[in-house]
Amino acid sequence: MSNILVKKFGGTSLQNIDCINQVAKIIKQDVSNNYKVVVIVSAMGKFTDNIISQIKQISDVTSYHELSEYDLIISSGEQISCGMLSLALQKTGIKAQSWLGWQLPIVTTDDHAKARIMDINTSALKNFLVNNDVAIIAGFQGMHKENRVTTLGRGGSDTSAVAIAAALGIDLCYIYTDIDGIYTSDPNIIPKARKLDYIAYDEMIEMASLGAKVLQVRSVELAMKYQIKLHILSTFNPTKGTILCKKGEINMESQLITGITYNSNTASITLKKVKASFGITTLFSIIAENNINVDMIIQNMDNNANDITFTIPEEDLPITETLLIKIKDEIMYEELIINPDVVKVSIIGVGMISHPGIAYKMFHTLTSNNITILAVTTSEIKISVLVPRKDGQLATKYLHSSFELDAESNLHTTS
């Protein structure tokens, strides 16, 4: 079946009845153009955030069984979106039906709240589309081998959409949101930020992992693996958006820096005077076993004792702190310092590979504006710095200006 479109609509695109009707209008036009449409939906508006805040009033949710119930609860938002959109489409005469993760099924690992997709069975979906128009699938969720509901982590509906496209053999996935593409920085922080017409997978992976909120990083990794183009569009503003594709389809020669990201979802942890190297090995082994992502790592050695500083997502701070207190005697440190008052600011661009002096320009821009650099990490296409939270937005603005990202000539174009 070659006439299938895969489209994902985020929470802001579904936040109220007017928005749902607008989404239904977009889908109805596709059906009028003789397409079958597979739609992946997020929860309406702030539903998931609101339900999480209520969960926290009941439980800290740290054990496996608590996380299982947590997934059951927070996956309910997508179920509501599915049903509401299906009703809106049926009202207009469209043959639509909602599907939950277990009904396909979408099979995942049993890592509750951070599950990974193992397999998607599309047989029932394909059979349904033979005589029907639209399948609406709940994003963000699946089920593991014990038939319990799992969720894919925040933003997981993006990953659901790309995975479903891959399972169907579709090489283009449309991602609808409330903004009209990928920008050089967050327009809420940088009013002069420019929209990119095209961006390469590896740049977008860095931007997503470093704080850009348009796409979940796992969805970009999956798109790159299966060579699925992602077209980022606004539900409410009919512009051409941004296309995410491989480097060979973009004229990269003129590019230096593609974007600046600002990530406030970070916290730093320092362990003072870790006594031996095996303590460090044990530390990061235990953190990995608990599926906690460590980013920046800084080690200072003095007389066979180490000070270790590392950063983690802010939401992982409670469980990480609990773990570190529990294993204090095992890894032998003297003091634990928690600092949530930091942000990570990063510059990203494939052009920096062949241009010396980028790091100097970044550091000089920050220090000349009295912004303290607490930590640095680099890769071929990005440099990240940790700065005090109070300086994060200023740092982003200074760097965006310094690298002239609001200049028309810096936008990605087709080759």
State each model region's role.
Residues 1-220, 311, 387-388, 407, ...:
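Nucleotide/pyrophosphate-binding catalytic subdomain
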Residues 35, 94, 228, 292, ...:
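Short phosphate-binding/catalytic loops that engage adenosine nucleotides
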Residues 42-48, 232-250, 305:
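Terminal amphipathic helices with adjacent charged low-complexity linkers/tails
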Residues 172-176, 230-232, 295, 375:
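Short hydrophobic alpha-helical runs that function as membrane-insertion/retention elements
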Residues 223:
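Acidic-aromatic/histidine active-site loop/patch
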